[in-house]
């Protein structure tokens, strides 16, 4: 593989609260997942983040989440597939309008947090979300956890998909991410994160917390924009990729 997408979750500030490192991380990524007001973000932050993405020629993506600002969208909420569909259509629509007003357009959609993790393991919810994306714009790329129900649902709906891997998270033997509540869920060393990503890209494998290797399809790499090491990770990772002849560009264009 000679090209890979680097994405980051951004636009997660709201009101008087500043979250993340959007301005500093934007030069190192190729696609931005912008919060749409439910788990984080607001109209002003969305507009500013779209403008920043356009300035850096970064692909604009909607990052719809559960309506849970207090929990940052990382707490499970029992929703039906129909509710999932409606939440996603609503949030894509909000960012679509803000992007269009500035001469931009949406490139992709990536669910956030608990919505992402719930749908990755729930085919009915994953299909509802994928259908929501398709019904808004069948040309949008659908980002989802590699090997999960999200990718299967995106393909079934007729969407282009981008299988996502994580630079700053560890993996379990079934290919799932280690729960944030578990020990060693996060990778805090930039060199370790870069080594994990390079192996996923070059060998299609990742070492799990159980000490085994599992196969993984890496088409887009996430660096969490709210992490303490986000900017250092992005700078280190982009440099390592380029040194190995791997171009950074938006996923599945």
Swiss-Prot record:
Gene3D superfamilies: Glycoside hydrolase/deacetylase (3.20.20.370)
Keyword Nucleus in annotation: no
GO MF annotation terms: 5-oxoprolinase (ATP-hydrolyzing) activity; ATP binding
Known catalytic reactions: 5-oxo-L-proline + ATP + 2 H2O = L-glutamate + ADP + phosphate + H(+)
Self-association state and partner proteins as the record states: Forms a complex composed of PxpA, PxpB and PxpC.
Family of this protein: Belongs to the LamB/PxpA family.
HAMAP family reported in the protein's UniProt record: PxpA (MF_00691)
Protein name, per record: 5-oxoprolinase subunit A
Organism: Shouchella clausii (strain KSM-K16)
